[in-house]
Amino acid sequence: MNDDLLGKEYIANWTLNAKQHFDDGDYEWLCDIIQQCFPEESCKRILELGCGAGYSTLAFLLRDYSVISVDINDEAITHTDNLIKKHDYTSEIKTIDGPDFSQADALLWKKDLVEEWGMIYALTKQQESFKSIDLIVLCNPGGNISRELTLREKDLLTSGGFTCEEICNNIDNGCIDLLHKWAVIYAACALSKATGIPLLIVERETEGEVNRTLVQISNDVNMEIAKAFSRPIKNAPDGGTLLKNTMDTTDQLCWGAAVYLPVDSQ
């Protein structure tokens, strides 16, 4: 399956789940975390790494944040654009090689910003343009990914801490989504370190696994957890993004969130 078809499949599968999370108040909870951790006057512009179906973007806008969202999936960008415009917000879709902050409520960057999902790493080269960003948000990292895409981007995985042997073993064992998830997480942490901007990571797993994941991230990438939060998922969607294939699917799924601060910036 090519990347365009994967993008359409992702939006088709995720939109109903994302709408359910929105209706259940999960994204409101996420906004509450931001307001609890960051005073309103100190956090006005959010950089969202991956907009998905657009419901998290909409939730941010409803709380009066301005949002810059970057996604490699053109279908996700289009869906998000349509969704927020239905709620009377303005947005601009741009294909650019660096941040260009507009007066719109939301600025959506298309995947041509850089090649494939290595885009987050490439953003670290634009540090001077991030002075007006107050918070980076990475929500439920992952998404659909093909075997070919993982192999093509294995250099990013090795720079994120994986050995070539680990990459091959995980691909052979069908754990491609896990590799993709961690590569994106490492990239987001690298961006936070390079810019000195706090990073909010939100993960969806069982309660025990999400806690281990949040701690493991901080240890692996030398990031300090300032605050951590959790919230049970009321209506757990089928095929949720889980860290381990062997996980007992009868366990309660929950949202886990943590505010990460680069240790060097303390």
Predicted feature locations:
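Conserved alpha-helix/loop element of class I SAM-dependent methyltransferases that forms part
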Residues: 23-42
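Conserved class I S-adenosyl-L-methionine
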Residues: 43-52
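Conserved SAM/SAH-binding beta-strand->alpha-helix loop
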Residues: 73
